[in-house]
């Protein structure tokens, strides 16, 4: 099945300058390597991207006491997941919180089957890790965001060639 959608994601940072990532795998494709991703999902009809980002963050992580920031990045990605082909135009917000534990709320069945866990990552640890991450260019663009140097306009971080994730 082909799904063309607009989506919202969140780079969630805590007071210790760590980023929160969800560990996921494709429940349909056992040969696809697990990855770490920023929380997010589809934008509902008439829904603002910041509202969608906050809703998705809560559903996927259980973290709800946040300060939502602006859209820092955009990306156009195409990928297969759970037997679906996604063509996704994404707005990626930054948000801050005091911390929190992974306690997902209201996951869709496919998400519940895909999510392995989640945790906070320190910048150095993320930059040194060879674990696959999404967005694919997260490591290249995260350092100034964690330092508080937000772009005046969203930066397009789309992969050069659209690739499966």
Give, region by region, the residue ranges found by the protein language model.
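Generic short beta-strand segments
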Residues: 23-25, 71-77
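Unchanged
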Residues: 42-67, 75-133
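Hydrophobic/anchoring residues in structured secondary elements
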Residues: 68-73, 162
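Nudix hydrolase/Nudix homology domain
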Residues: 28, 34-35, 102-165
């Amino acid at each position: 099945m082909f799904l063309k959608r607009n989506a919202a994601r969140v780079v969630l940072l805590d007071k210790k300058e760590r980023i929160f990532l969800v560990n996921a795998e494709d429940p349909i494709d056992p040969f696809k390597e697990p990855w770490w991703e920023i929380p997010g999902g589809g934008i509902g009809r008439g829904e603002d991207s910041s509202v969608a980002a906050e809703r998705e963050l809560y559903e996927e992580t259980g973290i709800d006491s946040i300060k939502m920031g602006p859209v820092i990045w955009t990306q156009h990605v195409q990928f297969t997941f759970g037997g679906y082909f996604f063509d996704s135009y994404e707005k990626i917000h930054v948000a801050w919180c005091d911390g929190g534990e992974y306690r997902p709320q209201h996951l869709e069945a496919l998400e519940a089957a895909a999510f392995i866990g989640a945790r906070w990552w320190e910048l150095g640890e993320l930059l040194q890790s060879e674990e696959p991450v999404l967005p694919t260019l997260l490591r290249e663009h995260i350092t100034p965001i964690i330092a508080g140097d937000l772009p005046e306009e969203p930066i397009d971080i789309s992969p050069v060639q659209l690739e499966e994730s």
